Amino acid sequence: MRKISLKGLSEIELQNLCENLSFPKFHGTQIYEWIYKHKIDSFQSMQNIPKKLVKILSETYFLNSLKIKSSSKSKIDLTTKFLLETHDNNFIETVSIIDNNRHTVCLSSQIGCNVDCDFCATGKMGIKRNLKTDEIIDQL
């Protein structure tokens, strides 16, 4: 059985999920807070969730859809580029740019690009697919 991502689900969807698993709805709110407020990366970090529910979640769902494959820091400023691998073995890039009093993050929303700029390798591959909600969230 293929696991499903919990990231991208709303608080109501997580409440309904808990209810469908025969747990009180309020655990859905707790899970929502662990994912989006505390930014946990494992189900075992959810300290106020019943162990039985944690076991079910870890067997059926996952939290992180991207793996950091590499990162490179600019030699001239505080820019860092991350190469990330998706669950289906595709690659995307995310860039963190720190400048004066600002912090900008450039997120990918698609795998590939159809612009085909001469200087960019990504455009040569065309568009493979749009990223899912959890893949966009995981870039942050």
Region spans (language model):
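Conserved Radical SAM active-site core
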Residues: 92-94, 100-109, 114-140
